[in-house]
């Protein structure tokens, strides 16, 4: 979800509504039970709107997980919307604020039909763009700027794996999101 919100993103309420409608319709077509979203702007407000729209557009019941962060602001975050008919979140959402806040979150879920549990980690690693310095400077190896930061973010997820599996009581762990790296780049092979 790119630039969804008010105050930071669309320039007017008309643009906001167009973007909201387009995004909601696209999500409804995916027909998922859980949406792990990145690039959410205006925080809880955007998640609440999308959950309400999904409920309206699909006839299924959707909710979002309130992570307790502020509603408005010029920031992006990650978050979860889930179908309450199919899954239930369990445990308290864990935040991993290594390098960039509000963009790496971990939540346990239980599938209602089977009782199976799993852990879903939604992430949005630092972008390759910009002009980093030191280890974050573009090294000319095709991985772009801030590769060291992305590696640090990946290592942070791995180093907290045991904590997450203990917290949520399960070892089925799925990492999703925008890692801003290709399959053979350092953040993925770490």
Language-model region placement:
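Divalent cation-coordinating acidic motifs and surrounding scaffolds
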Residues: 1-190
């Amino acid at each position: 979800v790119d630039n969804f919100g008010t105050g930071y993103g669309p320039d007017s309420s008309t643009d906001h509504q167009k973007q909201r409608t387009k995004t909601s319709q696209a999500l409804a077509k995916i027909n998922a039970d859980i949406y792990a979203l990145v690039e959410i702007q205006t925080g809880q407000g955007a998640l609440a709107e999308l959950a309400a729209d999904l409920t309206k557009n699909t006839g299924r019941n959707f909710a979002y997980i309130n992570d307790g962060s502020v509603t408005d602001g010029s920031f992006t975050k990650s978050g979860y919307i889930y179908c309450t008919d199919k899954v239930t979140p369990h445990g308290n959402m864990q935040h991993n604020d290594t390098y960039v806040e509000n963009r790496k979150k971990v939540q346990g879920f239980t599938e209602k039909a089977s009782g199976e549990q799993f852990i879903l980690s939604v992430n949005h690693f630092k972008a390759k763009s910009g002009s980093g310095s030191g280890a974050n400077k573009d090294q000319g190896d095709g991985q772009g700027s801030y590769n060291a930061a992305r590696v640090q973010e990946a290592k942070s997820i791995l180093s907290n794996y045991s904590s997450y599996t203990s917290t949520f009581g399960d070892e089925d762990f799925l990492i999703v999101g925008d890692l801003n790296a290709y399959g053979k780049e350092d953040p993925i092979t770490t």
